[in-house]
Amino acid sequence: MIRFLGNIEAKADAKGRVFIPAQFRRQLQSGSEDKLIMRKDVFQDCLVLYPEEVWNEELDELRQRLNKWNANHQLIFRQFVSDVEIITMDGNGRILIPKRYLQITGIQSDVRFIGVDNKIEIWAKERAEKLFMEPKAFGAALEEIMKEERRTTNNELK
């Protein structure tokens, strides 16, 4: 399974083409992923780039949770899959970000790629800089989460 890690800056050209960072490109090529799926994130103003296999797994999980005989579920599924672009890297390792995505996300020239487990987020640099907690707040939040996990695990063992 592919795991993307890191936070890498890049530049998009006037046409919206951007080089996928080398470390991510190597991982994609080692997994023989030639097709990538791009969509706007459901919650944030960034793009999410999925290897095709990961996209298919996420789509299968969503499909399993939805009832195809429920009109609202059909609407949700349709919206989720319709706002997608199938992307391929060119021979130089670049992808083209569609104009509508550039506008929605505020991406101009400075781009930030963030590896988030099995997918890659693509952010306008100035928006990405506002994403992260201050180190002390991050440490405290992580400590609290891990305490809760340990309490839950310890209670299950009793």
Curated annotation (Swiss-Prot):
Record flagged with keyword Transferase: no
Chief localization: cytoplasm
Keywords of the record: Cytoplasm, DNA-binding, Repeat, Transcription, Transcription regulation
InterPro entries assigned: MraZ (IPR003444), MraZ_C (IPR035644), MraZ_dom (IPR020603), MraZ_N (IPR035642), MraZ_sf (IPR038619), SpoVT-AbrB_dom (IPR007159), SpoVT-AbrB_sf (IPR037914)
Compartment annotation: Cytoplasm, Nucleoid
Entry annotated with the keyword Repeat: yes
Family annotation (PROSITE patterns): SPOVT_ABRB
Superkingdom assignment: Bacteria
Protein's GO biological process: negative regulation of DNA-templated transcription initiation
Molecular function GO terms recorded: DNA-binding transcription factor activity; transcription cis-regulatory region binding
Signal peptide (from-to): none
All residue ranges annotated as the SpoVT-AbrB domain in the record: 7-54, 84-127
Any one cellular-component term (Gene Ontology): nucleoid
Family under the similarity heading: Belongs to the MraZ family.
Subunit structure: Forms oligomers.
Name the record gives this protein: Transcriptional regulator MraZ
Highest classification ranks of the organism: Bacteria, Pseudomonadati, Bacteroidota, Bacteroidia, Bacteroidales
